[in-house]
Amino acid sequence: MAPINIVDVKKNYGSVPAVKGINLAVADGEFIVLVGPSGCGKSTLLRMIAGLESITGGRVEIGGRNVNKAEPAERDIAMVFQNYALYPHMTVRGNLEYGLKNRGTARAEIDRRVKEAADILEIGPMLDRKPRELSGGQRQRVAMGRAIVREPAAFLFDEPLSNLDAKLRVQMRVEIRRLQRRLKTTSIYVTHDQLEAMTLADRLVVMNGGLVEQVGTPVEVYDRPASLFVAGFIGSPPMNLVPIEVFHATESGGTLALPEGTDMVGLRPDALLLEKPAEPSIRLNAIVELLEPIGGESHLHVRLGEGQQTIVLTVQGRPDFAESARIDVFARIDQMHPFNSRTGRRTD
C-alpha cells in the first residue's frame, strides 16, 4: 500500500493538450474513481500513473517516490484492463504465476500467493482451465487475481467492467469493492459510467476536457455539484438545468432569493414533488409530456408553462396523468442549486 500524489501533471500530443495540469493526492488505501465522458483525459492520466504514457509536465509520486522516469515494472503497481489481457494458451494457474516466475519468486511463495488469490476470488476450481473455457466474469476475476498475486503498492483499473453485460457488471462491481476493502490497497479506477463511479468510490474525481471539475465523496458531488458540467453528468436522470428567466416565468407560491450572479437553477429529478411539502417551496406550472415507467418508479417529463423548457421528475409508482394535462410541480427551496452559465460554477 502507498499514497499516490499527482502534481501539476500535463500531457500534450503535439500541440494538443490532453491533460491540463492535474493535482490530486490519493491517500494510502483509498479507492479513487476517475469519471468523465470519452476524451476527458481520465485514461490518459491513468496510463501516465502506470508509466504507459510519458508525462509532458509535472510529476507522479508513488509511495513518496518520483516515478516519472521509472518503467512500469519499477512502479510497484498492478493494472487490470478492460480486455482482461490474459494469455490464451496458458491455464488460469499459468496466467496467475507468469509475472511471479519472471521476477524469480520462489516456488513456495508463488504457490502461496496463487492459492490466496484463488480463495479470495473463488476461482480455485478453474485453475486448470484455459481462458476460452471461462465466462466474461470469470475472466475478469482471473485478471484481478493476476494483479493480486503481485501484492502491489497500488491497483490501477482501466474500465474493467465495460465488456460485461449489465447483470455481471453489478455483480463484479460489488466484488471489486469488497476486494479492495479486504486488501486495503490504494486503488485508482477509471470509468465513464457514473453509476459505477458513485457505488465504488471513496472519492470521485470528475474530469472534463483534460481538467478536474470536482473532487469529493459521491454524496458530496451529488448533493452539491460544483459546476454545471458536474450537475449534468452525475445523476440519472441528470439534474434539470433551468434558465432563471424561464424559472421566474413559471414559478409562484413562494419567495426565492438567489445569490448574486445566478442565471441558472439546478433541480434534481428526485427533489421535485407533485404535492406541496411542509418545507418552503416554489410551485412551478407544468404540462405533462411523457411518463416513463421503470419498475417501482417513473420518470415524468413535463414542460414548464407555455415555453419549450422541459424537466424530468422521478416519482413513485405510475401516476395516471393524461398527456398535455396541466399540473403543479413543487421544488423545495433548500434543494435548489444556483449556477452562473458564463462561469459554469455554483454561485453559493
UniProtKB/Swiss-Prot annotation:
NCBIfam families documented for this protein: PRK11650.1
Name of the protein this chain belongs to: sn-glycerol-3-phosphate import ATP-binding protein UgpC 3
Entry's Gene Ontology cellular component terms: ATP-binding cassette (ABC) transporter complex, substrate-binding subunit-containing
UniProt keyword ATP-binding present: yes
Source species of the chain: Rhizobium etli (strain ATCC 51251 / DSM 11541 / JCM 21823 / NBRC 15573 / CFN 42)
PROSITE patterns reported in the protein's UniProt record: ABC_TRANSPORTER_1, ABC_TRANSPORTER_2, UGPC
Family annotation (Gene3D superfamilies): 2.40.50.100, Nucleic acid-binding proteins, P-loop containing nucleotide triphosphate hydrolases
GO MF annotation list: ABC-type glycerol-3-phosphate transporter activity; ATP binding; ATP hydrolysis activity
UniProt EC number: 7.6.2.10
Topology in the lipid bilayer: Peripheral membrane protein
Catalysed reactions listed for this entry: sn-glycerol 3-phosphate(out) + ATP + H2O = sn-glycerol 3-phosphate(in) + ADP + phosphate + H(+)
Enzyme class: translocase
Residue sites binding ATP per the record: G36, P37, S38, G39, C40, G41, K42, S43
Transmembrane segments: none
Gene (UniProt): ugpC3
Domain ABC transporter: 4-234
Keywords for the protein's UniProt record, in alphabetical order: ATP-binding, Cell inner membrane, Cell membrane, Membrane, Nucleotide-binding, Plasmid, Sugar transport, Translocase, Transport
